Amino acid sequence: MKAKRIYEIESFIKENKTASIEELRQRFNVSINTIRRDINQLVDMNIVKKVYGGIEVIEDSHKAVDYNKRNIENSNSKKIIGELAANEIEANDIIYIDTGTTTIHLLDYVDKHLTFTIITNSLDILNKASQFKNVTLFIIGEKYKPITRSFIGIDSNMLLEKFNINKSFMSATGVNIQNGLSNSEMEENLIKQYITSKATETFILADHSKMGKSTLLTYCDLSDINKMFTDKIPPKDINAFCQEHNIAVYF
């Protein structure tokens, strides 16, 4: 499976810091063209960079500022979106809250005495949920990824199979008609894909800067979401698409 192989290549590179193309080809038993395509995908994801004869990892410390920057961009809009979406959380719900700089505001507007279940891979959601007296909390993911402040791991899907999720609150770095909801992190994309395929309802929380954009990896078709929470009326094509597919839009 390509996604699993790329995940394993990423893990290998992060552990060893550098690798030659031939070393990777032999280790993963694929053709030179296949390994080059895999490398190009990791380069596009800003995980590795090409050097003479091979690749080397881009350290997370060089990318951490990106999260901090995202966290302050359109911060007021993200709070408004969080408040709008919080109205969807009801007693006895079993919900998934995605990692992201918009979804982190969701719990700020929920009654702290409400009884419901949260499943998440977000460190920020974990910290906020700990303040809720009547919440049952499940954390997925085998290792912590500082750049996204999330827990990741390819085996998370095995745990997710056990959960019946009625509402998923998702984030995205791109929202458009052709490529749906997208992001740029392979490990997170696998979890997002599984969650949106399993949840009864999928809600996207995304500000206007994400609309019309597409990034590396699609995890959900736009037609598969149930509600969109944003800060401005979406572009005409997206708004018309939502009307056509009975997707409620809140802003």
Show which residues each predicted segment covers.
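HTH-adjacent hinge/linker in prokaryotic transcriptional regulators
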Residues: 2-8, 14-22, 27, 33-99, ...
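Alpha-helix N-cap/helix-start and coil->helix boundary motif
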Residues: 103-104, 123-126, 235
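Conserved phosphate- and dinucleotide-binding cores of soluble alpha/beta proteins
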Residues: 11, 18-24, 44, 77, ...
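Active-site metal-binding loops of divalent metal-dependent hydrolases
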Residues: 100-101, 208
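Ser/Thr-centric signal marking residues that sit
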Residues: 34, 101-103, 117-120, 182, ...
